């Protein structure tokens, strides 16, 4: 994968980062996630991250039915998340922050605490995912993936620039596809935790095929 010159090296990753628990929001290393931030505690979180050297925010999905929007209580979260560097920041006239996160590296949460301003800070372990910061030169059989992708996009009514898809590198293709497809939270988490590009591609194909199979009522005949 390609990293920005602004991304930290592995030994520059901090021992703790602010956590943004957002349902069904998946960030992968090399992906980009736009966010519209308006709750006071998360405005404070973004301000905290901007003041840090690495400008990192950890994206973690809630693992249960806890509503992270209605209460400051500690929500139930998946253990593994992905840290994104704030690469774009803009203030709006109505008091929102519009930001974009560039995925840098996955992490496991060790422990966390609630800050006085209402957002979470977690001590994190980066070591299991040190390879996220290396360039992945793995090969990928793209044709079966793109064939399933075309049928899945047609099913969902998605429009895309197929020329751009064809020109994207393997890592970018998998990151973008994993992030934009409307999978369930547990499926998105499986994609996040996949330990290789090949396994993530296999998972994506299985998930899209299952959606196609379900829509067809179990009839897999193609026309």
For the regions a language model picked out, list residue spans one by one.
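Positively charged
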Residues: 1-163, 186, 197-200, 206-223
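Core structural elements
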Residues: 165-183
